[in-house]
Amino acid sequence: MRVLAAMSGGVDSAVAAARAVAAGHDVVGVHLALSAEPGTLRTGSRGCCSKEDAGDARRAADVLGIPFYVWDFADRFKEDVIDDFVASYAAGETPNPCLRCNEKIKFAALADRAIALGFDAVATGHYAQLENGVLRRAVDADKDQSYVLGVLTAEQLSRAMFPVGDTPKDRIREEAAERGLAVANKPDSHDICFIPSGDTRAFLGAHIGVRPGSVVDADSGEVLAEHEGVHGFTIGQRKGLGVQGPAADGQPRYVTSIEPETGTVRVGSARDLEVHAITADRAVWTSGRAPSGPVECTVQVRAHGGLAEAVAEAVDGGIRISLREPLTGVAKGQAAVLYRTDPAGDIVLGSGTISGTDARPNTQ
């Protein structure tokens, strides 16, 4: 097969490309330039799309003996990822930009160009397992990235390859060193690549501006503080509320709801965060078709953690999810990714974007 290897400049994508070469594929490496202004992306060894990373990717391609190119996706990235991120926060949601990048850039815009140029698949360094269209969790549970791939359609999965998902991260680093790849010990990236300072609130403030509102006690309705915009808050947040002292019962306060229309941020106790039911829109099913009835599954609502046993049902292009046990910190805009337990690695069934929650179990 002709394989386009998306090379971020990190160790995982370098080994993914190396494995594609070793498997006998005709491989070409590509690095995505995601900003028209390089200074707006993080620099240094911890980036995933910084200007230094392009050099690391090129050097890895040279070691592997494969052609290498840099493709400019800055405009698409701004429109589909950065602008979406800002708009979502302004609407009181909590988006995951890596998830959107996979959905709109790596496995859409990039994959479309690859197919148009005669490639059969795009290989990345994501930690997930994919075989015959079935997407599973990675062997290395600590590095599993199936959650941020749960938005991919059956068509997108049909042209994807994840060569490192069957191997623990420590072994990937060892393999990189054995192959003479200089990125073998390069630190992992963790933060949002287009926020170089790591200060998400400041970034959003610069893009959205001041939209004042009130922090209100969820029980009494008392105004506790003023704020400069709902984009500075997320469900379950405890710090940075601008509120002096604990609640009346002596317990910490948490953000329990965000109302962008009025600029109201409500805070309450930990018990007010419990969610028993979730509704999600923009449903995607990895099999290509929605299930005909209720499905026993596990739902994950954050990239790390937020797991619960559940029953999910496809409803009007969305998903209704009833939880077997409550979850906390569930925010609109997050993805709800559904899994079926399997000894070979839990299988991703599909996903939806959380549009609502309920403290009461679904009864329908």
Curated annotation (Swiss-Prot):
Disulfide bonds join C101-C193. One of its GO terms (molecular function) is tRNA-uridine 2-sulfurtransferase activity. Residues 143-145 are annotated as: Interaction with tRNA. The keyword ATP-binding applies. It catalyses: S-sulfanyl-L-cysteinyl-[protein] + uridine(34) in tRNA + AH2 + ATP = 2-thiouridine(34) in tRNA + L-cysteinyl-[protein] + A + AMP + diphosphate + H(+). One of its GO terms (cellular component) is cytoplasm. PANTHER family: MITOCHONDRIAL TRNA-SPECIFIC 2-THIOURIDYLASE 1, TRNA 5-METHYLAMINOMETHYL-2-THIOURIDYLATE -METHYLTRANSFERASE. Catalyzes the 2-thiolation of uridine at the wobble position (U34) of tRNA, leading to the formation of s(2)U34. This is tRNA-specific 2-thiouridylase MnmA. It comes from Rhodococcus opacus (strain B4). The lineage of its organism: Bacteria, Bacillati, Actinomycetota, Actinomycetes, Mycobacteriales.
